[in-house]
Amino acid sequence: MKLLVIAIAVFGLAADGPLPDFSGTWKQSNEQCSPKRSGDVTLKIEHRDPKLVVETTAKGRVERHALQRYTTDGAESTSTGADGDEFHSSAVWKDGRLVFDITEIEDGKRLKSNEIWSLTDEGRSLKRVRRTEKAGEQTLIYVRIQ
């Protein structure tokens, strides 16, 4: 019986496979986003599970930068967005995807959202499905450039 339990546990771990590594430099593919986006957004990601560091650069009329530090173990992290808003986030793995619960504090209001990150196109694209109270569902696609 013990051998059966061990075999099931080992098989279950093998079936899940390795978790995605989001490390790299990613450029937003405006045409693939839904709804379509404009602007020039780049993510530089360092991912050494459970640590995840995301540097966002958005170029437009004004260039903006943001640095977020997360852990993938469900611990809450606090960061400041490119627009100066405060974010409280937690992230956990679920079915090989990274699931974020986010609370944004904007003008004293608490706005809740969530994101699901996954790699697609054999790891060449990062897909972020974002659900927010004010904007509904958005799908952001980033293409690996490095």
Go through the PLM ranges and name each one:
Residues M1-K2, D21:
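Serine/threonine-rich low-complexity intrinsically disordered regions
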Residues D16-Q146:
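Hydrophobic small-molecule pocket/channel-lining residues, especially in calycin-type beta-barrels
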Residues L3-A14:
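Sec-dependent N-terminal signal peptides
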